[in-house]
UniProtKB/Swiss-Prot annotation:
It comes from Glossina morsitans morsitans. This is Salivary protein Tsal2A. Glycans are attached at N260. Belongs to the DNA/RNA non-specific endonuclease family. The gene is Tsal2a. Keywords: Endonuclease, Glycoprotein, Hydrolase, Nuclease, Secreted, Signal. Binds double-stranded DNA (dsDNA) with high affinity. Binds double-stranded RNA. Binds single-stranded DNA with lower affinity and with a preference for purine-rich sequences. Shows residual nuclease activity for dsDNA. Facilitates blood meal intake by lowering the local viscosity created by the release of host DNA. GO terms for molecular function: DNA nuclease activity; double-stranded DNA binding; double-stranded RNA binding; metal ion binding; RNA endonuclease activity; single-stranded DNA binding; single-stranded DNA endodeoxyribonuclease activity. One of its GO terms (cellular component) is mitochondrial inner membrane. GO terms for biological process: apoptotic DNA fragmentation; digestive system process.
Amino acid sequence: MSLLYGLLILAFTRSCLVVGQCSINIPDDLKGEEAPVILVKTGNNVKLFRPEEKTTTFPKGTELLLACTGEGNGLKSNGQETTTLSCNGNQFESAAKEKLKDMSCKSMAKAVVEQTTKRCMGNDFNLYEAGYKVNGKFYGSVYDICYNGKGQSSGYTHNFIYGRTWKYKLPEKPYEHYSSRDPQAGKDLDKLYKEQKERFKNTKVNGKPLLDDEHYFTEGQLTPDTSIITGADKLSTYDYANIAPLFKDIYDGNIWRYENMTQELADQRQATFEEYTGGFYSYEVEKWKPIGLDNAEFPTHRVPKYIYKLVVDTESKDGIVFVTLNDPYHKSPASENLCKDICSEANINEPDFKNVEKGYTICCSYGDFGNRIRTLPKDIHVKGLLKY
């Protein structure tokens, strides 16, 4: 009898804790690319919602501020840019009794890239955040960006893969690239990409044209949209602050391969992975003559020679660095190895990693990589090797 009494008390206590709580469920409450941006308000604290868990529970008194950012945008229900949902009973509702799952914007919410007061790359660059401006105030970040504020070629981005919600992400589709910080600069970059073959028509490598129908520069996302859950957050990855010029067959080859492997691993382990992705050194056809999209003597949008991706399990702190040679013409790519290749130790057996046209790729320990390339923050902590 005493045991039964104890169980009844426990059940009653648990039910009392649940009463009044509300939750956001992925994907039910954030369907479609027109889902609004969600800010979570607890007391005086307002934060951008991050879709880390399939179900995120909030205490009584929590409010959600829904926003449809971007010029001319607004909620389909009332045309307003923002509305507030309160936790009533066990679900979030507006004053008009609208539910979160029924709310959508007239068009996709637009993100912006905002400069912070922090510095990066050994204090050479500013750190930026991708996020949203709501009622004149910035909320971030969807991901972080370290770059010079003009062109992304030697900086890096920092993002997360949420393994517990990754399989519920909005399906990918291509969007137009843009520059939220300088729209004209975005248009200029569009033109540089579109007219590249004409610009480089006289540039040869190994006696052949540098660019042709198979080998050309594409807009390479450092933080990939395939790692992002919601529509508005995905669109933010098309900002040119997140784009580096990479050879198309390499970006679609091994760079895509290990990113996809990593996303699937996060899903399998239901883990959260932290990523740092960047480029370094400049691609050259002739020594000391770096190649840039503008094909100028001193290019402003340089093509990186290498692309790297550091992946760290946020719980175990195990990590690995993928390093890809962004040069489909290199005749002896192994001579460019920056560290000991430990792919086999990480249970990675990808024959295409040695295919130079798909991007010659090796795996490095973080310590080995960090001894050669000192671009990342010094406070990154990696304990062991992340195995696949």
